[in-house]
């Protein structure tokens, strides 16, 4: 308990620890979410699904990718969506770290609701 008082008196030690913890938790969360989407998509194919008559789902053994690549424009593939999600996560992490940095610089005498 005595050591926690020492750390609270000297905020210089606390500035890098929360940033590292937030960065580490963001990396773990993004990894967990990317692995979770792969497992959920593989589980959805295992469920019993009865396609409607007259749809392309009835042609399970036909590869439509070559035909689609001739007709359709290229879009964001599955890795592009993951990269976009990671990019947005880093953007929000940056905002969180800026807020944490601002809170760490406040002294007890200053009110916490100052204009930005």
Swiss-Prot record:
The keyword Transmembrane helix applies. One of its GO terms (cellular component) is membrane. InterPro entries: TMEM213. Residues 1-35 form the signal peptide. The chain crosses the membrane at residues 80-100. Its main location: membrane. It comes from the Eukaryota. Residues 36-79 are extracellular. Keywords: Membrane, Signal, Transmembrane, Transmembrane helix. Residues 101-116 are cytoplasmic. This is Transmembrane protein 213.
């Amino acid at each position: 308990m005595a050591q926690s008082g020492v750390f609270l008196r000297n905020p210089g030690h606390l500035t890098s620890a929360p940033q590292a913890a937030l960065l580490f938790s963001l990396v773990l969360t993004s990894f967990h979410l990317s692995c979770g989407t792969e497992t959920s998509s593989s589980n959805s194919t295992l469920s019993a699904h009865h396609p409607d008559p007259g749809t392309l789902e009835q042609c399970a053994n036909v590869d439509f990718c070559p035909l689609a690549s001739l007709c359709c424009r290229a879009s964001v593939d599955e890795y592009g969506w993951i990269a976009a999600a990671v990019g947005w996560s880093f953007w929000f992490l940056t905002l969180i770290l800026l807020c944490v940095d601002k809170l760490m610089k406040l002294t007890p005498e200053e009110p916490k609701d100052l204009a930005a």
